[in-house]
């Protein structure tokens, strides 16, 4: 076979019989695998399995398979949420704003805590207050973090009657401070130290006057008193007593040998009021951001945010997403990668990728990498800091910016794919699905406002308005639309036979076009067998349009029955 004919048969996926060598070509079009769309590629240059339109179908079996319809309404919220979260059992949390939520990293947390940022200030809630009553949940929350006391203890040495300091060398100099403790056992940073206290006679009691706990919503119910102890040339603060928060007076007569552990929460500050983007890394470290500052909590203590655990980026941060013990930080400029086994060892580096993040809600963790909506397409970043424009080969920058409105993307990972709801230029919502393995996209005709992926049951629940349903959770198949590439033949050809392989051909609709003119249109219910005779038609550019509710495994066009491939 001449090289030109062989090359043409590969490029145009037309199988030529040996008679082609003698100048008699008998081609056929045989589509044996089906995939999604690659809008960047000219339709006639697409791979034979690609489509120019793929809607409400998937290709997990390598063929056209209808997605199931969305399920019926499973739950109706009292608000129109922008964020939902499955707390446990039948309890669903919903917020009218974009909210970032994490579960408590504490092992077997008896309180059932979750932590979240909602754009107002960081919060924590627990089962005892979140699920009370009826209506929208969570029913209540506390401000995240424990504030430091603002007033120092007032100290008075209680000298006994007639007691004298006979040995000035045993005088003890002390300072006192206190911390607040929440009902969950979370201890905050210490307040200011007291004035110097000199105890001339050993074990002389010291009377402490404490200030009331300020009005707050941090769930503070206790306070801890510490006093300084010198030893080895260094001073430390050791625990004297733990008191109810309402106690305003205490007498310290505890011998030094009976003091408790040293103060360990010096820098356990509450997170900043404007922190958002809360997420949890694999090593128990929570992360968030505010402006161009990314911050990390102490490990397994999401209420404690030391200032030394903060880092800055050149541009304002748009979104953050954990990958194992690393954190991908997408900004209005280049992305960053922060890594470390503990908060104090975390360091960051800028990733050389000129792709700003255009949508905070577009950033999701896939399997081993993160995807977010960049300037020119979806950007992929892995835990090693390797960045790439994931959709470069299938969507052009112009198509991305004009057709997909990246600033509007709200995305979720499900079944290894990137499910993105966005607003089209005409204001209507649409959904596209990016398959990183297949490197194609497809569309779904079920737009939504927000969603939540249930990994245990492999269900993606979506909310439209106030109603929650399961994506592809219905019993009936969706109406598919799949349009093949345009097969450009070397010369005008007349195909006379159409074969459609399907387990349910009666549920499949087929339209064949020649040079954009319909040759045959078979609505669902018209096919009773697999082979159909085509009306006489000649064309150079052929295309097949699939519709209906049935799976399609193979589509073949041939010039005669005898030329149909096995």
Language model: regions and residue ranges:
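Structural motif
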Residues: 121-128, 292-299, 333-339, 376-382, ...
